[in-house]
Amino acid sequence: MLRVIVLGAAAGGGVPQWNCGCPVCRAALDDPRLARTQASLAISADNAHWFLINASPDLRQQIVATPQLHPRAGALRHSPIAGVILTNGEVDAVAGLLSMREGSPFSIYAHDKVLAILRANSIFNVLNESIVPRRPIATDQPFEPLLPDGALSGLQITAFEVPGKGAWYLEGRAHPGGDSQSGDTLGLTITDKSTGQSLHVLTACARVTDDLKARLAGAPLLLFDGTVWRDDELITAGLGTKTGQAMGHIAMAGDDGAIAALADLGIGQKLFLHINNSNPALLAHSAERGQLETAGWQIPADGTEVTL
């Protein structure tokens, strides 16, 4: 069976953000049940070996909160985490790697462009490549990630290009991996080889193209970019100066938003993740939450598990 754990569902900074008093963050400060850590997933085909989709800055907290990711009883050093698949080079996708520097073996899988970012930042050298190899992945070429002992994982992963943008901290600077936008933002199709069940993960997506609709149609499970409800919400709320589009994220709502664009595709379960603190849909009793739930979408809490 294919198992998915939502380790965190929030966008960069989490909810509440450390210095924010917006309505969503204030509500989460008053009621910790509303809090969410930064977006990351754990995927397994055997319930024993797990692969992370992105390593959020909150990863240590997420591991502590997730028994499936704890060291084996009686082992001095052990982790069931077999690898990390990176979908982009943003801070909230790679910073958690620094919390995995204690010498347990696992592999990092990423596009060459993201691996170039890691090479260009010497702080990531705390991950000894003889123990934590960095394995390039190519788009539209299925691969089976390996367990630390070289055994096959039982998962098949296909990365594909998604409309998006490069890491914000590289804006206006030379990209270590070159100027091409190829590899900046990846989606993933993950399949359990024994059952054929599959899911799609898109932690960032700037727009839904016809090709993307065709790829996602009929999927049993979709985990999709839910950063903002409205494209201009950070600006209108006084929280920022960029639109969702400028950050590489499609809005949930609107004629060109994700809810409308992905309707009527026969998708089974639809979960939003990477949800920004500015997004009113995080509030359980908001009109926005009601609209997305009516359209068949869910806002997962940290720790939500789905089995296919």
From Swiss-Prot:
SUPFAM superfamilies membership: Metallo-hydrolase/oxidoreductase
Pathway connected to this protein: Cofactor biosynthesis; pyrroloquinoline quinone biosynthesis
Record's protein name: Coenzyme PQQ synthesis protein B
Transmembrane portions of the chain: none
Origin organism lineage: Bacteria, Pseudomonadati, Pseudomonadota, Alphaproteobacteria, Hyphomicrobiales
The keyword Transport belongs to this UniProt entry's keyword annotation: yes
Natural source organism: Rhodopseudomonas palustris (strain ATCC BAA-98 / CGA009)
Gene: pqqB
InterPro entries given in the database record: Metallo-B-lactamas, PQQ_synth_PqqB, RibonucZ/Hydroxyglut_hydro
HAMAP family reported in the protein's UniProt record: PQQ_syn_PqqB
